[in-house]
Structure formats: C-alpha cells, structure tokens
Amino acid sequence: MSTGTNTRIDGPLVYLESPGPEHLPAIWKVYLDAPDYFEALTGSADFDPTAAEMMYEEALAEDNRYYLAIRRTDTKSLVGTIEFEAGADEVPATLRGLVVAQGERGKGYGRAALELAENFLANELGVRTIAADVPGGYDDGARFLEALGYRERRLKSAEFRWVKRIAES
C-alpha cells in the first residue's frame, strides 16, 4: 500500500489529504471539469470513470507514491488532485500528476498544492530535486511548471523531464 494513504499536509490556501474510495465521485467531477488534462493523460476526450478509478487504485498500490486530494481551506471542497513519488527513477522525486478543476484554475490552488508537496518532500523526506512528468501535448502543464521554476532537462536515460531543485545540499 502507498505510503501516502494517511497523509495530510496543511497550508494556508489549500491542504492535501489522502482520499478514500468515498471521494471518487468528487475526483471524477474534477476530471470532468478538466477535459484538457484528462485527454492529454488518457488520449481520449471521452471521460471514463473506470480509467480515473484505475489511476487512483494504481497510485495507492505503489510504495513511495502519494496520491492526494487538493482541498480549499476555506470551503473544504475538493478542487483537484496531486500525485508524486519519492525515491524512484533517476531523480529523488517525481511529480506524476497535478490537476485542478477548470472552474478553480487561476486562483493559486495548483501552485499552493505543488509548493506544499515540494516542502513536504524537502523537509520530511530530504529530497533535494524533483522531476515532473507532463503528458504530451499538455502545454498548459509545461507553462505552469516553467512559471514555478522547473526547467526541461535531459536525464542520463536521454529522456527529457521537467526538473527543479527544491532544497540546497
């Protein structure tokens, strides 16, 4: 089972918490309200709740993987999800996914969630560098990461990833 199954990270604008199966309808609603992200991720514009549930189950099944709901602190409403992994690949941590419902974008929730995750990785797990996966063709995701200090780099595997140093040595 994932190490992120009982995680809660508090912040002033949003907090991150491990969702349970009862949260799946709210997560589906986020994906329905973010068709651009869902299409880039799955290759299909048609929302499939089974695909969203499989992504959720897969994230919870892996060690060192955190799949967290993004909730507004003022209303406690679920506005997105963030998924990251520690201790894998060529880098100490990888952002696997971050989605905020379109109706909630531009309000700082995605930025706040990513900053909470980066601080958690640096302060709790000692991670100094994080890479990020961006689905092909998801230009909004690439622009978002670039605005937050991520840079596209070639890894030893010759693969290109978005990378950011989140703590000093």
Mark where each language-model region is:
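Conserved acetyl-CoA-binding loop-helix of GNAT-fold acetyltransferases
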Residues: 100, 106-120, 143, 147
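Conserved beta-strand-loop-alpha-helix junction that forms the acyl-donor binding cleft
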Residues: 105, 131-142
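C-terminal "cap" of GNAT-fold acetyltransferases
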Residues: 3, 13, 128, 137, ...
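Conserved acetyl-CoA binding element of GNAT-fold acetyltransferases
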Residues: 91-102
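A short helix-loop-beta-strand connector motif used in the catalytic cores of GNAT acetyltransferases and
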Residues: 56-69, 80
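Conserved GNAT acetyl-CoA-binding A-motif
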Residues: 123-133
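Conserved beta-strand in the GNAT
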Residues: 69, 77-85, 94
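A short, well-structured alpha-helix characteristic of acyl/acetyltransferase catalytic modules
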Residues: 1-57, 168-169
